[in-house]
């Protein structure tokens, strides 16, 4: 297990594009090994939520689910989403979603920053808003 800590608390936080590119670099490093490896890359972070301020309690189910769709089918567009859109639509803590783009950037359909193959297979998708008032999503994708 090799954990990567990505700062999304102290500004400036990395852009989605930068996280997406990190995923591509990780895949390139993994592919450089002479032997087959069993590799799992996990992106983590809460979905829409805001814990403080006038918008405390914000949850945007529609935006979260549209973001999951885009993450699967248009990851380059997802990576190009500006920070202000995350904050506006998903709350101040919604910026955590950029960390998911590390995992998505490492998928085999991404070549030189572009989608050049079939989208990954969705093995599992889940969305829920628990009592903690932080939207939770799970997305398990498998290379084709």
Regions found by a protein language model. Give the residues of each.
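Divalent-metal (often Zn2+) His-rich catalytic cores of metallo-beta-lactamase-fold enzymes
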Residues: 45-55
């Amino acid at each position: 297990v090799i954990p990567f800590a990505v700062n999304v608390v102290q500004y400036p936080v990395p852009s989605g594009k930068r996280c997406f590119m990190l995923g591509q670099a990780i895949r390139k490093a993994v592919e450089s090994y002479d032997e087959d490896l069993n590799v799992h890359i996990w992106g983590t972070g809460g979905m829409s939520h805001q814990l403080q301020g006038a918008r405390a309690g914000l949850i945007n189910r529609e935006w979260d689910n549209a973001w999951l769709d885009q993450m699967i089918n248009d990851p380059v567009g997802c990576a190009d989403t500006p920070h202000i859109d995350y904050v506006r639509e998903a709350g101040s803590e919604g910026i955590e979603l950029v960390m998911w783009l590390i995992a998505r950037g490492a998928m085999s359909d991404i070549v030189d920053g572009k989608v050049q193959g079939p989208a990954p297979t969705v093995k599992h998708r889940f969305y829920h808003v628990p009592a903690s008032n932080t939207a939770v999503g799970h997305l398990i994708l498998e290379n084709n």
